[in-house]
Structure formats: structure tokens, C-alpha cells
């Protein structure tokens, strides 16, 4: 695994706020650009920066380069006992992993800055205009071409394969955690993001379920996790990727179960019900060892309560299309949604699947720029706060906005 140096920043005064693009219990996310004096330094520290309004070629001699654009995540402190803690275990893990990971299809972490006075942590990432969820939602009005779908899928697999080769499980693969660059030379480039639940999995000292009992967002959670497997593998990421691929094809989620409110239990009956209705009921004959999983008796009871298909109905649930391409895509996603994690296809194997290697169109790294076609355009990310002018944002600091010390 190649290590990339992480510069110690002088502070966030090198960045100008363009707007706030997100807010949650974790804190806030801002879109920002580096001031001219900082752009060159940021560019030389990494190739992961995003140029604003980049039209494709490098700047001509004597021509000014556009400022680099970033997403800056300000993380709130939280209580652990009587102390205010800025660096949660998830944040520390994300920083450590992203310092080590270096791949075109994994989001790049440029800077880390801690403000002791504000008790706040700032993470400076490369900026992407969309997440995959945005693209899927917009595809209902603007259907994606076969080229765009295939190129998105292929890049996701490249990112997952790189992670797994580095002994990293993501454990929260979902469309919202997959970013897509929307402009410039990297239009349509995929970036796996949000590594807060990711972890190294080589030779774990203890059962992974002892560390975090529930991982992966419900709709993308593998059946072995729902049955409370104490030890699980990178195959959980491949199940999630299979759900995501079906979503790209269909324009909607595949398994939309309802989580028991307030429950932290791995077993979620409604989610398994949604899976069984599409893929059929697994048995110890088709999934070796499932009878030893803690929640297997619940599956037996579900089989007594209602009749599930004995064979997969996936062909009826996903619009695979006709011909050789449709059959190959069905085979690929079926192998990603294999119940038995030991039989589930790996990212490396999936990259060599005939759907990508033998059937046109050939997938590329720029999913929005299909050769010989007009470039695809999508609505870009909007700011959460829309009534502030650019001049207003320029006059305030990140910390002022974050702490509520905003000028009128």
C-alpha cells in the first residue's frame, strides 16, 4: 500500500468559503476554494484537487489557472464522559486509512486541521459535484446510457478492488457515499468516500461484531450481517455493491426494508423479507454454514410464516435489458448478490467479467463523456444556505459560521 504525505496546514485562512453544502449531527460541510497563493501549494501536494470551471486542457502559457475547489468538513466535538472529544474513533480511523489510500477512485484527503480553541476538526477533501444518489434520482427524468451505467459500475469495482487489496473493508457502501466529479477533465470519475466505518480486516484479533455490532446501512446490508455473523469478510462490500448496481440499472433501491425503530439488533426481519421475496429463501444446502449463524432460527420461523420463492426472481425485479449484454449483467449482479459469502464474486473477479471485458460499450474512467456523444450534464449540488451572497461568505470565517457567530 502506497503512503501519501499529508501536509500540516497553516490553517483554514488559506481557503475562501463559497457556501455551505451540508449539515448533520457530525457538523457541517462547506464548498471552498484556495486563495491564489495557496492553489499552487495545494496542487503540488497532491493530484487530487478539483479545478473550478476546468474545460479540459492544461492552462496555456501566461494564462492563470482556475482556483482549486475543495469540500471542507468541520467535525463537532462530542462528549465522552465529562470531556469534550473532537477525534472520535471513527474519525481517527478515517484519517488514518485515507492517509494510506491513494487511488483515482478513492476520495483524497488533502489537509487536517484541529482548532484547540473551537474544539473542532477540519478535514479538507477534494470536491465532487454529485454523489451517486443524486445521479440515480436524476436518471428517472434523464435515463443513463449503457455506457454511463457500465462506466460508473466499473469504477466502483476498481475502487473496491484497490481497498480490498489494501486489506480495507468499507462497511458502509451506499450511493450517498460514492461521489462523482461533474466537471472538468475528470467528469464522471467515481470516488469512494466516507470511511468512518472502514477498518483493516487482516487477521482480526477478535470478532468484528465485538467492535461494531451493526455496520452497513440497512438497504445495503449483507444477509450474513442480518443473521449476526460474528466474523465476516470483504464480501459484505460486494453485496452492497450488487445492491448499488441494481439501483443504477433500475433507478430505485432494490431492497427497501423498514428498520425496527430504536433497535440496534443486527436481525431485521422486514429487510430479510424484502431480500427473500426477490432472491428466494436460502437453505443450508445453498448457503453452507448458515444454520450455525445466531439468527438462523428466525429464518426458519419466517419460512413457516409465509411462502417464499424457491428460485431467484431477480430477473423480474431488475431491468437488465435484452440480448447478450442483459444476460451478462444479470449474471454479474446475481453473483454479487450470492447468499453464501464464500461463493460471492470478488471485486477482482467482477472486473474481469464478460460484461466489462467482452461486450460493448467499453467502460471508461469518465462516465459522463461517452465517445462520439454529447456530454451528459446533471444538476450540480446546491448550497444549503442560498440567501447569502458570495461577498457575505468571503467576509466570514469557517469557525464563525460553525459556532453561530454569523454577521447579519
Annotate the PLM regions.
Residues 28:
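Conserved N-lobe ATP-binding subsite of Hanks-type protein kinase domains
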Residues 53, 62-70, 74-102:
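Conserved N-lobe beta3->alphaC-helix segment of eukaryotic protein kinase catalytic domains
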Residues 102-111:
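Conserved HxN/HPN-centered segment at the entrance to the catalytic loop
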Residues 118-131:
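Conserved short submotifs of the Hanks-type protein kinase catalytic core
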Residues 152-153:
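Activation segment signature within eukaryotic-like protein kinase domains
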Residues 279-334:
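C-terminal lobe substrate-recognition/regulatory segment of protein kinase catalytic domains
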Residues 357, 361-408:
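C-terminal intrinsically disordered, low-complexity extensions immediately downstream
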Amino acid at each position: 500500500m502506497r503512503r501519501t504525505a499529508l501536509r500540516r496546514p497553516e490553517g483554514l485562512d488559506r481557503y475562501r468559503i463559497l457556501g455551505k453544502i451540508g449539515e448533520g449531527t457530525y457538523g457541517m460541510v462547506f464548498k471552498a476554494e484556495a486563495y491564489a497563493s495557496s492553489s499552487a501549494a495545494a496542487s503540488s501536494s497532491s493530484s487530487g484537487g478539483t479545478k473550478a470551471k476546468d474545460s479540459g486542457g492544461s492552462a496555456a502559457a501566461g494564462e492563470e489557472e482556475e482556483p482549486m475547489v475543495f469540500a471542507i468538513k468541520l467535525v463537532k466535538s462530542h462528549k465522552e464522559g465529562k470531556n469534550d472529544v473532537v477525534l472520535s474513533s471513527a474519525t481517527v480511523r478515517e484519517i488514518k486509512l485515507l492517509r494510506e489510500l491513494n487511488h483515482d477512485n478513492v476520495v483524497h484527503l488533502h489537509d487536517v486541521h484541529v482548532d484547540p480553541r473551537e474544539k473542532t476538526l477540519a478535514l479538507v477533501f477534494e470536491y465532487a459535484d454529485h454523489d451517486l444518489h443524486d445521479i440515480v434520482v436524476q436518471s428517472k427524468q434523464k435515463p443513463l446510457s449503457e455506457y454511463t451505467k457500465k462506466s460508473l459500475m466499473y469504477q466502483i469495482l476498481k475502487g473496491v478492488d484497490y481497498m480490498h487489496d489494501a486489506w480495507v473493508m468499507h462497511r458502509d457502501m451506499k450511493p450517498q457515499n460514492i461521489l462523482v466529479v461533474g466537471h472538468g477533465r475528470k467528469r464522471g470519475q467515481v470516488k469512494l468516500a466516507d470511511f468512518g466505518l472502514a477498518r483493516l480486516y487482516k487477521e482480526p484479533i477478535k470478532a468484528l461484531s465485538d467492535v461494531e455490532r451493526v455496520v452497513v446501512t440497512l438497504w445495503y446490508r449483507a444477509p450474513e450481517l442480518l443473521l449476526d455473523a460474528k466474523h465476516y469478510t470483504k464480501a459484505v462490500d460486494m453485496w452492497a455493491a450488487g445492491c448499488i448496481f441494481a439501483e443504477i440499472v433500475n433507478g430505485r433501491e432494490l431492497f427497501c426494508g423498514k428498520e425496527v425503530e430504536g433497535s440496534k439488533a443486527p436481525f431485521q426481519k422486514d429487510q430479510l423479507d424484502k431480500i427473500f421475496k426477490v432472491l428466494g429463501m436460502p437453505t443450508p444446502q445453498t448457503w453452507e454454514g448458515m444454520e450455525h449463524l445466531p439468527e438462523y432460527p428466525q429464518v426458519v420461523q419466517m419460512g413457516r410464516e409465509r411462502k417464499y420463492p424457491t428460485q431467484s426472481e431477480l430477473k423480474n425485479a431488475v431491468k437488465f435489458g435484452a440480448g447478450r449484454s442483459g444476460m451478462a449483467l444479470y449474471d454479474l449482479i446475481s453473483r454479487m448478490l450470492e447468499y453464501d459469502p464464500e461463493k460471492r464474486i470478488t471485486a477482482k473477479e467482477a472486473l474481469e467479467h464478460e460484461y466489462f471485458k467482452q461486450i460493448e460499450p467499453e467502460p471508461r474512467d469518465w462516465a459522463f463523456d461517452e465517445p462520439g456523444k454529447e456530454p451528459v450534464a446533471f444538476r450540480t449540488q446546491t448550497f444549503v444556505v442560498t440567501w447569502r451572497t458570495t461577498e457575505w461568505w468571503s467576509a466570514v470565517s469557517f469557525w464563525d459560521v460553525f459556532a453561530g457567530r454569523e454577521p447579519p
